[in-house]
Amino acid sequence: MTVSAEIKKPQNTPTRYYGFDAVRIFAALAVVLTHSFALTGFEEDRPIISVGNLNIAPGYLGVCIFFVTSGFLVAQSWGRTSGVREFVRNRFARIWPALTLLIFASVFILGPIVTTVSTGEYFRDKMTLEYLVKNSTLIFGTASKLPGVFVGQPGSSVNGSLWTLPQEIYAYIILASVGLTGLLRRWWGGLLIFTGFVCFWRFGFYAGSGPRGIGFSLSIVNVSFSTALGAWFFAGVALVKIPLRGIKLFIPGVLLTGVAFAVGEPLLFFIGFPMLVIGCGASSPKVLRGLHRIGDPSYGIYIYSFPLQQVLFRYGVATTPVPMFLLAAPLATLLGFASWRFLEHPALIALKRKKPAATIS
């Protein structure tokens, strides 16, 4: 299936923004920080900042940053692709190689080693198959537990980071569906979708007060959280059409975010914080060019860190938040760089060689 001539855009070379690598690494490490409290039994002591009735832990802030930057970069990727098939291939190559390795390693290596049940019972339990299938496909949400794995620990999930990945997939589906209409060619197209998500969130769909889930997210994620993540994603999409980058976007973003905290209005935070994030990301300081050449470990940090932290706690290596973070952060970063170097980047390069005109974000 190809995008019509009205929707297709020229396949130009994208502008290189070196700031996104640092921004996404910061986001991933913020998630590691929050999990360092939750997985050692000190969740109530984790740092929290509040904007009105919106409480924000570093991990949630990191997730917001990931969705904003993803919306910005994936919208640009959509504009450069020749059609839906190419768009799907690009997204598949970015998410599934590392995810597949993680899921199979979790089920067939980590699980049998740390489980408290027999190997036979472990593999016969329907939880094992559910974990493998759900987390490998993502379409119908994720599974969080394996039989006998990490039982009795403050957090019993095998990988509590994966729940956001289906939400990312849903955002891609919405983006492609809207893109096929040609709406994203308009400066107000992404802004319209962003406004819709914010309205769902703002007018009554707060966590715990609305119905549980809609569509594919039924019984998986509370709809208030889904609408919030949709808002962050399409805030990034909307900013593609704003002709401001770097400091020109960063300064108004800082001002709006500051006002949001000062007056306690989450809506201003939804507007200002994405501007701040893209202002940082869409910059090209020379000091970050070296980091860009090394690669982007952020996705690997995000998906590998949680089971790593669980193992560190299980064997008594780190049982309080600060030691956990100081150990898990560099180890997860090393895993992230290794994943990028030997798995994620080769997968993207292989796809580029197959489709020379494609540019993958």
Segments predicted by a language model, with ranges:
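Hydrophobic transmembrane alpha-helices
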Residues: 72-79, 175-183, 232-244, 274-286, ...
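Membrane-interface helix-loop-helix regions
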Residues: 51-57, 95-169, 274-275, 280
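Functionally critical transmembrane alpha-helices in membrane proteins and complexes, commonly lining
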Residues: 18-78, 96-98, 227, 301-306
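Generic alpha-helical transmembrane segments of integral inner-membrane proteins
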Residues: 29, 65, 100, 104-108, ...
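C-terminal "closing" transmembrane helix and its immediate cytosolic amphipathic cap
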Residues: 1-11, 309-361
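Membrane-helix interface linkers and caps
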Residues: 7, 74-91, 95, 114-118, ...
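Aromatic-enriched alpha-helical transmembrane segments of multi-pass intramembrane proteins
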Residues: 20-21, 27, 130-271, 304, ...
